[in-house]
Amino acid sequence: MRALAFAAALAAFSATAALAAGALEAVQEAPAGSTEVKIAKMKFQTPEVRIKAGSAVTWTNTEALPHNVHFKSGPGVEKDVEGPMLRSNQTYSVKFNAPGTYDYICTPHPFMKGKVVVE
């Protein structure tokens, strides 16, 4: 059990380190006023959100199945950035520091797609 907890913490740390280097920044807690996206029924319930630069988005997995948020490389994202697997009721927050369009998927369920448009 400890090994599983350690592996999850290591994955979260790795994702945070990768995100902090660019336009995306993983944050430990959702900042006040962050935009929420629920994960339910095998989809991101709000498939596209629009926010201002410097704002954050928080994803909450409401299902029993684990899901994640995986940003695909493209403008503003030098390489793919894969967030940790979220179990039921876990959250993942990302602050967006630069304008752009950021597409993402759920790695184990690539038909689950979303987009963050930062103005």
Swiss-Prot record:
The source's superkingdom equals Bacteria
Residues annotated as binding Cu cation are: H67, C106, H109, M112
Where the protein is mainly located, per its record?
periplasm
Q: Where in the cell is it found?
A: Periplasm
| Cross-referenced Pfam families | Copper-bind (PF00127)
PROSITE patterns annotated for this entry? COPPER_BLUE (PS00196)
The protein depicted here goes by the name Amicyanin-alpha
